[in-house]
Amino acid sequence: MNVLHIVMSNSFAGIEQHVNELASVQKNKSNISLIVSSNIIGKFDKHLDTKEVKNFGRRSIYNIVKLSLLIKNINPDIVHSHGTKTTQIINIVKYFTSFKHVSTIHGIKKNLNAYEKADLVIGVSSKVVANLNVQSKVVSNWWSPMMNGNSDIKTNEYALSVGRLEKVKGFDLLIKGWRNINSNLVIIGSGKEYKELKSLIYNY
């Protein structure tokens, strides 16, 4: 079976790492290809068959046609889109070529219209797919971290929070809210907010 994963992002974060790990496992049983944005292609497993495209908007007809031709050349049985924008683009591509479309929702979405045009939707929790009017399946997220070996953890009893250290994730609110909780909190992740969060922890 030929499976094609498509990710069109500007940064290599949670979704992208998920796809990289998923494809790396799937390649042992299926023919796996990836199409990813040119600015993140270097982050993916070098042993994967990865094609790069310029990240473009969902209204760029020229780039959608180019993507359609690339997909047609790969000739996948299944196209697996990740993220709302990518799913919307694949919904258009389906007018130009034929394949089964699987899409993964990586978080709670208010507008599910794009996902309901897929043949199957995978959600990371039952809550994510609860309101979908299309065949769906829950596959929980896994975690396969690459630790750098540095750790300040001095106890076996702690609360753990893992994620991308960006403002949108709200780790600053978590740290502030943890001030009066009598338990250790460990945060694992990387991102632009690392220094600010480290400073916030010391100040508290």
What are these regions (language model features)?
Residues 4, 151-169, 173-186:
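Conserved donor-binding/catalytic core segment of Leloir-type glycosyltransferases
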Residues 197-204:
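Nucleotide-activated donor-binding/catalytic signature segment of Leloir-type glycosyltransferases, i.e.
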Residues 5-65, 70, 193:
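N-terminal strand-loop element at the rim of the active site
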Residues 138, 142-157:
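Acidic anion/phosphate-binding donor-loop and adjacent secondary structure
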Residues 60-63, 81-87, 105:
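Short His-centered aromatic/hydrophobic patch
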Residues 12-16, 145-146, 162-171, 181, ...:
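A short, basic/aromatic alpha-helical/loop segment that forms part
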Residues 95-130:
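A conserved, positively charged/aromatic
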Residues 35-41, 162, 184-197:
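Glycosyltransferase donor-sugar binding loop
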